[in-house]
């Protein structure tokens, strides 16, 4: 997958999972950014603990790399509960989920990543478990088949997804708490980079932290990945204190520019400016000019460029904006609209 090959991919790659686990915050007090989510979760968790009840079932959604798994583990730590982790694709049969549910203790948290990928059969098992803490299972086959109910201890289901729109309404409606994680601002990411640098044993000054943060596309996972590469350059160069210049040199070497664009992003923008004169252009034409398939453009390259305001979609096709010309120090055509 081309997305997995990009240094600025927000998807898990290489040893991201191992590194993320080592440096992720363990409590809400250490959780940086997402102020609305943090404030709400502090209240919900404190209230549940005061009542001596499990936290309401919680859905966390947002783009990859923003800390959904981190927040799920923080919830477990704050509630003093054990977190049992699985994912939607892993739960292939109803029996898989039943085995997990029957092994939960009171107050435990069941964390299901990629919950939008649960099959309908699994969801049917989940509904009574979430609502009534009961497990309905069928024993036997044919006319002799019968349903039995197994009482479950009160627990909290925490679901995480990058695609909340794919959740079925019955499942979505059973979550009492729904939290959306937003992209991080540069200030929050700078603080995250400084914290991660300390955990990694890297001496990074404020300017170095800022340089990594502003090229990280609003995503902590990307920031931590870029930080590791900056650490490599500093180590080989014999730099003890890493400042802006060392960080710039490392990130320029990785072809990640000041906007967080890599070579694919820049190639698409330059193609639209130089070959199509900045005019609206169809997806087929862009695909042919870039030599990339349409799915790669729509799913991998284009979303961030649109989000940052460098490309817009018009009835006549994709078009670069004034910001794209400014980014490359190109003069706007006289007839640019």
UniProtKB/Swiss-Prot annotation:
Keywords: ATP-binding, Cytoplasm, DNA damage, DNA recombination, DNA repair, DNA-binding, Hydrolase, Nucleotide-binding. Residues 258-337 are annotated as: Head domain (RuvB-H). It comes from the Bacteria. Pfam families: AAA_lid_4, RuvB_C, RuvB_N. The keyword Amino-acid biosynthesis does not apply. Its main location: cytoplasm. Its EC number is 3.6.4.-. Residues 4-184 are annotated as: Large ATPase domain (RuvB-L). GO terms for cellular component: cytoplasm; Holliday junction resolvase complex. ATP binds at residues 23-24, 65, 68-70, 131-133, 174, 184, 221. Transmembrane segments: none annotated. GO terms for biological process: DNA recombination; DNA repair. Belongs to the RuvB family. Homohexamer. Forms an RuvA(8)-RuvB(12)-Holliday junction (HJ) complex. HJ DNA is sandwiched between 2 RuvA tetramers; dsDNA enters through RuvA and exits via RuvB. An RuvB hexamer assembles on each DNA strand where it exits the tetramer. Each RuvB hexamer is contacted by two RuvA subunits (via domain III) on 2 adjacent RuvB subunits; this complex drives branch migration. In the full resolvosome a probable DNA-RuvA(4)-RuvB(12)-RuvC(2) complex forms which resolves the HJ. This is Holliday junction branch migration complex subunit RuvB. The gene is ruvB.
């Amino acid at each position: 997958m081309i997305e997995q090959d990009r240094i600025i991919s927000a998807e898990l790659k290489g040893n991201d999972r191992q590194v993320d686990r080592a440096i992720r915050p363990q409590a809400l007090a250490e959780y940086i950014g997402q102020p609305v989510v943090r404030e709400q979760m502090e209240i919900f968790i404190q209230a549940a603990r005061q009542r001596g009840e499990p936290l309401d079932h919680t859905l966390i959604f947002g783009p990859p790399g923003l800390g959904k798994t981190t927040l799920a583990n923080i919830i477990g730590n704050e509630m003093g509960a054990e977190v049992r982790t699985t994912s939607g694709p892993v739960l292939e049969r109803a029996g898989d989920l039943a085995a997990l549910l029957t092994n939960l203790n009171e107050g435990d948290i069941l964390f299901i990543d990629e919950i939008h990928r649960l099959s309908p059969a699994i969801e049917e098992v989940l509904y009574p478990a979430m609502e009534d803490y009961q497990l309905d299972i069928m024993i036997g086959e044919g006319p002799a088949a019968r349903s039995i109910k197994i009482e479950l201890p009160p627990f909290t289901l925490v679901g995480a997804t990058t695609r909340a729109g794919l959740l079925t309404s019955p499942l979505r409606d059973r979550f009492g708490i729904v939290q959306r994680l937003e992209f991080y601002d540069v200030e929050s990411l700078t603080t995250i980079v400084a914290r991660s640098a300390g955990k990694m044993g890297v001496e990074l000054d404020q300017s170095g932290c800022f340089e990594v943060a502003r090229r990280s596309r609003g995503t902590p996972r990307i920031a931590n990945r870029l930080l590791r590469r900056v650490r490599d350059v500093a180590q080989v160069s014999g730099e003890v204190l890493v400042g802006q210049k060392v960080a710039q040199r490392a990130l320029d070497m990785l072809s990640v520019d000041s906007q967080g664009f890599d070579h694919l992003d820049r190639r698409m923008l330059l193609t639209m400016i130089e070959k199509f004169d900045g005019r609206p252009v169809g997806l087929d034409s862009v695909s042919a000019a870039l030599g990339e398939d349409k799915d790669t453009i729509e799913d991998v390259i284009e979303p961030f460029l649109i989000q940052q305001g460098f490309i817009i979609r018009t009835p006549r096709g994709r078009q670069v904006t004034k910001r794209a010309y400014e980014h490359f120090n190109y003069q706007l055509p006289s007839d640019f609209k």
